[in-house]
Every structure is written in C-alpha cells, then in structure tokens.
C-alpha cells in the first residue's frame, strides 16, 4: 500500500508538466507567439503542426526506450530525475523574446519549441508509465490518478491565478514580463519533477519489453481498447485545447481586455483558473463517481454529457463584460465534467496496458502511455493551429511594424471574427464533447 507521501510526490510530476508547462503552453503560447513574440498566425500554426509531426516519431520511440531502461533508480524514474533540469530550462528559454529579426525569431521559436516537445516527451512518457509499475491494485491506480489530476489542477490554478500579478510585479515590457515569469515557473517545474522522481517507488517489474520497432507500434492497432482510448484522449485535448488557446483572444477582442471585479483582476488566465480549482476538487470525486455509475467508461460518458450542455449554454451569453459572473459560472460547471474525466483517462490507459500485456504477452506500458502523451500534444497543438487558421479565415489580419514585429490589425477584428472566437470557446468544444460521449459509451473495457 503506497503512502500519502508517495501519492503527493507522484502528483508533483503532473503539477510540473500539466499544471505549469503544459498549462502555459496551452493558454499563453498562442497569444504570446502572435502578440508578444511577433510570429504571424501562419507561422504559429505551422510551428505547432511541425511539432506534431516530430512527436509522431519521438513519442513511441521514447515509450519503448523507457520500457527497456534498467538502472539503480528503476525503469522510469531516472528519466524524471535527470530530465528535470533541461525540462525547466528549455521552458524558460521558450518564453524569452530574443532581439532578432523576423527570420531569426522564426528559427529561435521553431528550434526551442521542438526541443521543448522532445524534453517534455522524455519526462512525461516515463512519468505516465510509472502508474503501471507502482501498484497492480485497480482502486489504488484510481487514487494515484486522482492525486495526479488534483496536483495538476491545483498547480494550474496557482499558475493561472498568479500570472497577471507576477507580470504586474515584474513590470517592464510584455516581453520582459513573459521572460521573467517563464524563468520563475521553469525553476519550480524542475524542482517538482526531480522530487517526483526521487520519492516515488517502482514495486512491479515490467514484463519483458521488446526492442522498439514500428511493427511493434503498428501492433497496437490490433488492440481495440487502445484505438478507443487514443481517440478519446485526442478528443479531450481538442476540447481543452480550443478553450484554453482562444481564451486570450476572447478577452482581448470580445471583452476588450481584463475585467476588474472588487479589486480582482480577471484576465484570461484568472478566468480559466476558476476552472482549474473546480477540476482539482472534482478530480478527487472521480473514483467515487466511477463506483457510483458502475464503471469508468460510464463516468466518462456522463461527464462528457455535462460538458456538452454547459458548452452550448456558454454560446448564448452576450459578449459583454457585464456578464462575466455568468461566464465564470459556466466555466466552473464545465470544469466539473472535465475534473471527473481527466483522472479516469490515465487510469483507463493503465487498464489498456494491462489488457495488452495479457493478450499479447509483452509489455507495452511505456509505448501505450507515450501514445497518451502524443494524443495530448496532438490534440492541444492541432486545436491551437486550427484557431490560428480559423481566425485568419474569419478575416483577422496581421500587420508588421517598422521593427518587423507582427500583431493583429484591430481594424480586421470584425463581427465575424468575434463570433468565430466565441464559437471556438463554446460550440466547437460542444461538438467534441458529443463525440466523446459516443466513444466512452462504446469503450470495450467495462470495469
């Protein structure tokens, strides 16, 4: 039986990866790259698409490599221990705006973003795989997953809530604020990742892992449960990706900037932080809810139903800051559903890994969890790319100043652009939630 101390240590891993690094990449990077760093919509969209093609190769290789690692620290833990420092350092560098021309900035952004994705894979794939070797008890897997999600959402809440206040405290230009904030958060992420690697335990020895081959990866397509799980993971990250990536544009253009309510500065990061704390609370409810409705897949199904209803309702709120309270209320309600299905997702991946070992006779834990990480990055990045492309399609144009920096032309933000932004936060996620319902209902593992 694992101790509370170990479960908290495990939670720190996703507090760093999900609550800091991925949260900032999801919600702040689209706006940062176009409005601060100076990339065009097209450059930002292509950057994320290129990174996804890169991940298609690196993620499964990393999963197989992690499965075959043998060291004094175990199979998966050394990747967290020794990957923690480059993880935090590269994240910090990615939020720095160098004094370069347009071409130099493109090279810097593309190089650092791809490197960040590689290091994220190097740390997060073994982290996810840890769940398969820390315990073989299904209920305890759910508990570890719940701790993981609580850690991620608690840190996500702290990150998003503190973001505008950190920037205000740092002062200076937007570029300087992002750079210093990135350095602070990078240090915190590195420390959390290292502590996670040092204080967790691998109690189970993985079943023999085959040397990686693309044939081995192709064999996953014979695993029906893995196919459903991959589709569900992509959809959950599409759902979250649309909402997080467009939130900054929604505040800038639909609500005309930050909203102040009783001295509380509500910008796009604080707005989404209300959802983070809700997810944190309901992440702890997920194991109980799964028992209540009879299975993980049905808990997933009903949480997707809730997300569908609340997302559609958000579309009908007027684009007026006077309704900020109602907007926050619906973000909280939507996050109740997200908070329930998020920990179940990773617990279900552990079930898929067990299913694969039972039916195929070899361990593919790292490979299967790497596909989960790849799905996470694929869904988030493609949604970010689509947002950039759809805003351009709706009529938003970029202008270039005398220094070669690009930004959105305010004159191009027409009513069609505003409706597109509003829909990307509400109707697009609603359609994804509908697909999630169907996939969860048909998921073949019933426990």
What are these regions (language model features)?
Residues 1-447:
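Membrane-embedded alpha-helical bundles of multi-pass transporters/translocases
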């Amino acid at each position: 039986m694992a101790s509370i101390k170990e479960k908290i240590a495990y939670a720190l891993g996703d507090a760093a990866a999900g609550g800091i690094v991925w949260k900032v990449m999801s919600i702040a990077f689209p706006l940062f790259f176009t409005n601060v760093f100076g990339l065009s919509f097209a450059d930002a969209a292509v950057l994320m698409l290129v990174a996804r093609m890169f991940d298609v190769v690196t993620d499964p290789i990393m999963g197989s490599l992690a499965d075959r690692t043998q060291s004094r620290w175990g199979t998966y833990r050394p990747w967290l221990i020794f990957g923690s420092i480059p993880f935090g350092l590269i994240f910090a560098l990615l939020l720095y705006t160098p004094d370069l021309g347009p071409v130099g900035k493109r090279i810097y952004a593309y190089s650092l973003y791809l490197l960040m994705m590689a290091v994220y894979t190097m740390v997060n794939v073994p982290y996810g795989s840890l769940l398969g070797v820390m315990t073989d008890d299904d209920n305890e897997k759910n508990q570890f997953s719940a701790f993981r999600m609580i850690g991620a959402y608690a840190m996500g809440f702290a990150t998003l809530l503190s973001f505008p206040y950190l920037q205000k405290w740092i002062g200076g230009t937007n570029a300087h604020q992002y750079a210093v904030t990135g350095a602070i958060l990078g240090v915190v992420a590195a420390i959390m990742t290292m502590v996670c690697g040092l204080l967790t335990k691998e109690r189970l020895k993985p079943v023999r892992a085959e040397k990686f081959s693309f044939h081995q990866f192709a064999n996953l397509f014979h695993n029906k449960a893995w196919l459903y799980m991959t589709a569900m993971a992509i959809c959950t990250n599409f759902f979250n990706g649309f909402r997080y990536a467009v939130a900054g544009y929604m505040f800038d253009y639909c609500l005309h900037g930050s909203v102040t309510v009783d001295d509380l500065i509500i910008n796009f990061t604080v707005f989404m932080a209300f959802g983070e704390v809700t997810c944190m609370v309901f992440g702890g409810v997920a194991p109980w809810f799964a028992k209540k409705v009879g299975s993980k897949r049905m808990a997933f199904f009903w949480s997707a139903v809730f997300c569908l209803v609340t997302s559609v309702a958000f579309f009908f709120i007027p684009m007026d800051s006077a309704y900020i309270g109602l907007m926050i209320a619906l973000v909280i309600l939507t996050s109740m559903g997200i908070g329930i299905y998020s920990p179940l997702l990773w617990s279900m991946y552990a079930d898929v890994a067990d299913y694969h070992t039972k039916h195929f006779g070899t361990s593919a834990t790292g490979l299967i969890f790497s596909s989960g990480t790849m799905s996470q990055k694929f869904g988030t990045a493609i949604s970010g790319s689509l947002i950039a492309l759809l805003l351009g399609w709706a009529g938003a144009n970029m202008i270039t100043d005398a220094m070669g920096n690009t930004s959105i032309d305010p004159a191009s933000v027409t009513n069609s652009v505003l409706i597109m932004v509003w829909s990307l936060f509400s109707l697009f996620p609603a359609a994804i939630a509908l697909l999630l319902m169907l996939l969860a209902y048909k998921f073949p593992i019933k426990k």
